[in-house]
């Protein structure tokens, strides 16, 4: 590129159209020209975009309290677990920001997290909300689909592929992401004697996960490994990827009881039984996880354990109404789009919560219960001109009686609603 002399005639900026005598400089490329003013403008645009891309990661790491506040907007209850997660995630990303030349040569190691709690207690939602809070790529994997390399199922590298896809194949962003592996308790060792049979979905998967949990440069096939064996591999360093492992660990309370029972020999035989299940989980130790079937090397790479409580009726009612994206708010908005008001009675909210507990689905089952109650309404209302309000009652949930429907003047339309 070069500056044209002043004796050149009729040279104009290809972008703004100004003549060369109207600007300070005119620079030429291959058949095109650009003036100094357009160069400055383009430079500003590029700088703004670069700054925006930088902010897509986090420029200022939120404090544990700020992380906790954000979690509180979306996740009801589980205060201890949220506090543990907020501190752990803050320390993890503070460690990443600190990486580089170190005067005291103290190396901060990664601490992955285990979430232990029943189905529907909020494990996945916590992990998702953390990733959203920090604006980092996030991927979910199911441990039950994983097998050792060479067996039918997913390789552990497929977990990394999902994170890379979530980062739009930006490896730098993916290397600072979060991966949530659900149902990690399902890869517990099936037998104390591993020589009896090959445990390809248990201890074998734990062994395969060890390296990526700790930190390694993994080779990831961009289209999945087994169907496209000749594809070029993507290299990704897992050292700074935070792994959150979730599982219900059904029966681990009995493991803890046995350990506590050994310590109370000589006391009343029911001494250990005074602990309820949630109090027992507070007593969990690495040796309990080992007795459950996790190998010591695997446990060592997940040093932080947070326990989630079983949600009671009051907690489930709050989940239905309080979070920013609460289900009641979602369905209310859905019917608003058809100019229909939706209302849930207090008794209906209690009935929904009680049914979720009966089904042992926790918060995860709330949506399906509401869908069952509203399916006919959502089918009929868009073509009904005289319905302006729908009220979900306790009978709607427990007795499958249709909701109360009201017209614009507040008159009850379906007076025969109580006839089953």
UniProtKB/Swiss-Prot annotation:
Residues 1-54 form the ClpX-type ZB domain. Coiled coil: none annotated. Zn(2+) binds at residues 13, 16, 35, 38. GO terms for cellular component: HslUV protease complex. ATP binds at residues 118-125. One of its GO terms (molecular function) is protein dimerization activity. This is ATP-dependent Clp protease ATP-binding subunit ClpX. Keywords: ATP-binding, Chaperone, Metal-binding, Nucleotide-binding, Zinc. Component of the ClpX-ClpP complex. Forms a hexameric ring that, in the presence of ATP, binds to fourteen ClpP subunits assembled into a disk-like structure with a central cavity, resembling the structure of eukaryotic proteasomes. ATP-dependent specificity component of the Clp protease. It directs the protease to specific substrates. Can perform chaperone functions in the absence of ClpP. Belongs to the ClpX chaperone family. InterPro entries: AAA+_ATPase, ATP-dep_Clp_protease_ClpX, ATPase_AAA_core, Clp_ATPase_C, Clp_protease_ATP-bd_su_ClpX, ClpX_bact, P-loop_NTPase, Znf_CppX_C4. SMART domains: AAA, ClpB_D2-small, zf-C4_ClpX. Pfam families: AAA_2, ClpB_D2-small, zf-C4_ClpX. The gene is clpX. GO terms for biological process: cell division; proteolysis involved in protein catabolic process.
């Amino acid at each position: 590129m070069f500056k044209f002399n002043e004796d050149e005639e009729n040279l104009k900026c290809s972008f703004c159209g100004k003549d060369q005598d109207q600007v300070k400089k005119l620079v030429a490329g291959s058949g095109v020209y650009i003036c100094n003013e357009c160069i400055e403008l383009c430079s500003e645009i590029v700088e703004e975009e670069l700054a925006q891309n930088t902010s897509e990661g986090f420029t200022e790491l939120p404090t544990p309290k700020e992380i906790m506040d954000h979690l509180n907007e979306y996740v009801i209850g589980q205060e201890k677990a949220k506090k543990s997660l907020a501190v752990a995630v803050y320390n993890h990303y503070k460690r990443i920001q600190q990486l580089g030349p170190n005067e005291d040569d103290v190396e901060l190691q990664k601490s992955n997290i285990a979430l232990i709690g029943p189905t529907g207690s909020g494990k996945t939602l916590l992990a998702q909300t953390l990733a959203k809070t920090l604006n980092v790529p996030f991927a979910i994997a199911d441990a039950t689909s994983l097998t050792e390399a060479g067996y039918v199922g997913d390789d552990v590298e497929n977990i990394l592929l999902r994170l890379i896809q979530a980062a739009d194949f930006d490896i730098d962003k993916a290397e600072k992401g979060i991966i949530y592996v659900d149902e990690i308790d399902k890869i517990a060792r099936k037998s104390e004697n591993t020589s009896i049979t090959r445990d390809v979905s248990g201890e074998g998967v734990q062994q395969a996960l060890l390296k990526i949990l700790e930190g390694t440069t993994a080779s990831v096939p961009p289209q999945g490994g087994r169907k496209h064996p000749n594809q070029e591999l993507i290299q990704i360093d897992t050292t700074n990827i935070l792994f959150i492992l979730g599982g219900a660990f059904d029966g681990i309370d009995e493991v803890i009881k046995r350990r506590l029972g050994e310590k109370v020999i000589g006391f009343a035989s029911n001494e250990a039984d005074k602990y309820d299940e949630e109090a027992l989980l507070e007593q969990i130790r690495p040796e309990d996880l080992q007795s459950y079937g996790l190998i010591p090397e695997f446990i060592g790479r997940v040093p932080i354990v947070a326990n989630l409580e079983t949600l009671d009726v009051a907690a489930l009612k709050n989940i239905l109404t309080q979070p920013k994206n609460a289900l009641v708010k979602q369905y209310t908005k859905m019917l608003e789009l058809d100019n229909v008001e939706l209302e849930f009675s207090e008794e209906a909210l209690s009935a929904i919560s009680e049914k979720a507990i009966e089904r042992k689905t926790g918060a995860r089952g709330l949506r399906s219960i509401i869908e069952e109650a509203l399916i006919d309404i959502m089918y009929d209302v868009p073509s009904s001109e005289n319905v302006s309000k729908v009220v979900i009652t306790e009978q709607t949930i427990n007795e499958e009686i249709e909701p109360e429907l009201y017209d614009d003047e507040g008159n009850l339309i379906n007076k025969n609603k109580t006839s089953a």
